[in-house]
Amino acid sequence: MRLHYRRRFNFLRRILFILCITSLYLSRDSLKLHAKNVLMDHNVAEYHGGMIDDIQILRCYHWYRQCSSLYAPKLHPSNTAKKIKDKNSILWTRVSKNITVETLYSLQSGPFYNSYLYVHLKDFQSNPKNTIKELAIARDSALIPLQVLRDINKLVKSSDSSVFHNHVYLREKPTSSWWKLLFGISVDTDNIAVFGEEWVYKGSGIWCKYILNDDDNDAPITNLEIYLGSSFIESRPSWKEVIHEFHRNNIPSLPISITRKLETKNHHHKFSNGLLGSLRTPSKDINIQVDADYKITSPHIQFSRGQRSFKILQITDFHFKCTDNSMTVINEIKTVNFIDRVLASENPDLVVITGDLLDSHNTIDYQTCIMKVVQPMISNKIPYAISLGVSDESNLATSAQIRDFIRNLPYTFNNVASEEGHMAIEVSFKKKLTKNTLLERDIDTEDETNPSEALFFVFDSFAPVNNFLQDYNDLIGKIDFGLAFQYFPLSEYRPHGLFPIIGQYNERSTLTVDTPRSRGQVSMTINGKHYKSFLDILSLWNIKGVSCGHEHNNDCCLQSKNEMWLCYGGSAGIGLPRIQGIYPTVRLFNLDDILDEITSWKRNSNLVDEVYDYQYIYKGKQ
């Protein structure tokens, strides 16, 4: 009996050994890939831009050394499975998302892996042939995106097209499904047939169009970005969403939006800001230098024709979180709509954002939150400048990453900010006018005097200003008037005794802000003279007023000792804690070169179409 069991055991052991050897042989390609990814260099960078010739959703297993890049086979579309076999693996780079928790933007997950979006960079970046020029992603891999169906419908109407050819796209299945669950690379093994030759199926619901020859004038895709959260809207020129708010069924987290950018020609040009369509004021013609990606390249704004005034909208304190909380999402949508309505009513020439776009550690995706804030300005081609606040930080990103993202946005003056984050925006009117010219219809261009100059400082509250201001000594005595903006209030915002005030002044406690300017500790020597007052320093450039954010329950303007008005921008975020009777508010300034005056007023979300607290910030002696 014992011999009988021993023989049976030896037989089973041989069978098991044969099965193991067979399984290892069949999965040898997958094992090689896994070994390659386990041992690969961890310093390989993620995808931050460049032309691509392939894109896939790939699994990154927990035992891989890193997920920034990995080796995987390339998918080849064909009519038969035999033609798509590719034993050689290529290096794929993951589409970058500058947050530290990788699982937040994984497209799928399993007990042993997370799936991400990967691309293959084209070898020769100078030649766009065989690169991807358009991209569409379906919410379900068994469905075809609407954009693809629309293009197919166009081809159906053409009897001489190749639409009647049946093309099947397959992915090789070298191993069994249970073994691939552990060791496979690909996520999707669909076989999908589509009529037409333009769109190519890449698996996992991804469809691509390629530049097939040198005569194709379409621009290639040069960048991809991922955004987390609801109510995201892509408004940047040359960018387009390829999938909007994709909800990952097996991951209880925020929806994902993926956007793509097309190549732009490398040249500089000018743009004239203003609202689109019938809302745009025809008399406005403001020239601002921007590059091919509409990033501002010069801090100088020049007026042409008869424009004689300059309007600034100050918005501050949004505290966007971009979480999955429904009330938070609704309030953020309402806030963006509020800003949209103000822009439609006022059509400002410049928007200054004085901090707290984010809500510190409560914010998940800082990029989505910032894009929500600036979307109204980008859509309306209105330039803007951002001064960061104390809440503009995130547990998932560094301060440098946040600032770098803002600098690369279109229409922002942050691209020309100093190393410390300060900005000086110069505005030149075509010529200096007086009240007498109000009655003149035609002005002789030969009698023009020097242009009128205005200057707007946008300071970073956390950085020193001494070196920055020294760079603008040559403008002292040449500026007609100007304004300064920053996030924190100055020490002069807490005056003693009686003082003029217009608006709500509810937070009057001692400033707890720990910056030299807010403590009144300023020391600077300019042109041989020593100054200890920041307001006295600003007056050298004829700055007539300062405006800040930070305090949600203050929206007033109060007058300082040297007759300079110190203002608050209110707080724009709907749903923020405020005392009763205080609504989300924005402040506007208008500089009139003819009347030689600066005026200010406010609008709030309760009565957007009405203005209130209209006042003079500066009134000349003409």
Swiss-Prot record:
The keyword Signal applies. Coiled coil: none annotated. It holds the Pfam family Metallophos. Keywords: Signal. SUPFAM superfamilies: Metallo-dependent phosphatases. Residues 1-27 form the signal peptide. One of its GO terms (biological process) is proton transmembrane transport. InterPro entries: Calcineurin-like_PHP_ApaH, Metallo-depent_PP-like. Induction: Up-regulated by ethanol. GO terms for molecular function: phosphoprotein phosphatase activity. Involved in the activation of the plasma membrane proton-ATPase (PMA1) by glucose. This is Protein SIA1. The lineage of its organism: Eukaryota, Fungi, Dikarya, Ascomycota, Saccharomycotina. The gene is SIA1.
